[in-house]
């Protein structure tokens, strides 16, 4: 047995060493369900274009598609008196230095919330290392993971010795599907869904995006670890057939080192399997940073719509009878609730908040309140201690700005 293990290790080391000098990244998920490939295509004598492909059980999911980011660091470079010739596209003159394959990961962990108490995290991983040879010291890594649930990749900027700031102005990532693919689209959260051919998606649509392929496969395009980035949507390419391009809501100013959100491509034989495999998103999100999580108690919530004491008492009774742990007062429990003139420290007269909260405690039902962004920005420091004093157990922030990088980090 020891000899067999030694031989296997020797073979693995040999493969990894060889892969380190390769210009192409090929990766397969632990059970061979998903496969991904990244490589550069020479477009001209001075231009390299990064492309990738994704397969599911040997069938094409995403055909040859562009990958990368567009940066505009000219202002910073001029401020440092650096004379660098700006390529038409920042990715054009990057060259692959190496491809390194990491050890396989196979573990389980317990989330604070979700559909399952135990999540299986198993994947194979590799990183492609690129750099510019023009004296600029720019580097970019493409980190790739292959799960049986899907493929994930992100762009990582190692720390730059001079250009502290990077300005990302465009996401070049594309998704090319076979002719006949259709997507179930929505232009904003909670918008009506519209089934459109890929070429007919003329306005940016939300992610997660579900795509139905002519070969019978179902695909989901989504992302993870997005709290330090702007909103990114999908739209049909104006120049390439059956291809979706990425649309950033705003530029993103970053300080290296820095990792972008994970891009996720899931494929399945049935659409329901995409939902069953959604643990991939939690696996790609960063671990919880809160040490003491005993106070976090996930659960269902029911909205009380009358904003009256009597209505709240009745709703709490219903929640208690049906094992719903929380009740929500949405807008209009303070007024005016959509204006800077609103005061979230004062409850409307028809609602006896202390009585309702006390009754909820008797019944084991916690009370949540909605607070508009106007009041949050104006009263945050005094409001949260006050709500805690009242016995409110949670706050739903309402109508917050979210699309730009600034508001995503807020």
Where are these regions (language model features)?
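Conserved, mostly hydrophobic/aromatic
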Residues: 155, 319, 398
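An acidic-aromatic substrate-binding cleft motif
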Residues: 255-326
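Short amphipathic alpha-helical segments and helix-helix/interface helices
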Residues: 172, 208-210, 316, 357, ...
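N-terminal accessory beta-strand-rich subdomains and adjacent acidic, glycine-rich linkers
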Residues: 22-284
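An acidic- and aromatic-residue-enriched active-site/binding cleft used to recognize and process polar
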Residues: 41, 147, 160, 180, ...
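Aromatic- and carboxylate-enriched substrate-binding clefts and catalytic-loop regions
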Residues: 331-410
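Bacterial Sec-dependent N-terminal signal peptides
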Residues: 1-23
């Amino acid at each position: 047995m020891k000899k067999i293990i030694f031989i296997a290790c020797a073979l693995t080391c040999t493969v990894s060493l060889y892969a380190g000098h390769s210009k192409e990244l090929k990766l397969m998920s632990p059970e061979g369900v998903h496969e991904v490939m990244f490589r550069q295509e020479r477009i001209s004598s001075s231009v390299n274009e990064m492309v990738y492909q994704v397969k599911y059980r040997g069938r094409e999911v995403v055909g040859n598609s562009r990958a990368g980011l567009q940066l505009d660091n000219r202002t910073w470079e001029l401020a440092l008196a650096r004379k660098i010739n700006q390529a038409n596209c920042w990715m054009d003159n990057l060259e692959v230095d190496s491809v390194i394959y990491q050890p396989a990961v196979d573990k389980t962990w317990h989330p604070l919330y979700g559909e399952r108490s135990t999540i299986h995290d198993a994947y194979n991983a590799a990183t492609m290392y690129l750099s510019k040879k023009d004296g600029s010291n720019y580097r970019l890594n493409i980190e790739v993971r292959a799960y049986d649930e899907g493929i994930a990749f992100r762009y990582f900027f190692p720390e730059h010795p001079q250009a502290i700031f990077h300005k990302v102005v465009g996401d070049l990532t594309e998704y090319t599907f076979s002719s006949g693919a259709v997507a179930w689209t929505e232009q904003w959260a909670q918008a009506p869904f519209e089934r459109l051919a890929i070429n007919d998606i003329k306005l940016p649509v939300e992610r997660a995006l579900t795509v139905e392929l002519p070969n019978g496969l179902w695909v989901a395009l989504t992302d993870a670890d997005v709290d330090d980035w702007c909103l990114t949507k999908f739209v049909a390419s104006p120049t390439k057939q059956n291809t979706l391009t990425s649309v950033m809501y705003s530029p993103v100013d970053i300080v290296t080192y820095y990792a972008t959100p994970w891009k996720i491509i899931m494929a399945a034989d049935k659409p329901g399997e995409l939902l069953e495999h959604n643990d991939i998103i939690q696996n790609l999100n960063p671990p919880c940073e809160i040490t003491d999580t005993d106070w976090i108690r996930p659960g269902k919530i029911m909205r009380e719509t009358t904003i009256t004491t009597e209505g709240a008492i009745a709703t709490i009774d219903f929640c208690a009878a049906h094992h719903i742990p929380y009740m929500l007062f949405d807008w209009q429990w303070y007024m005016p609730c959509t204006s800077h003139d609103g005061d979230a420290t004062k409850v409307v007269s028809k609602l006896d908040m202390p009585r309702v909260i006390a009754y909820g405690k008797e019944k084991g039902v916690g009370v949540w309140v909605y607070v508009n962004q106007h009041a949050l920005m104006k009263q945050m420091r005094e409001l949260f201690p006050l709500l805690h004093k009242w016995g409110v157990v949670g706050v739903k922030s309402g109508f917050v700005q979210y699309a730009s990088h600034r508001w995503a980090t807020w």
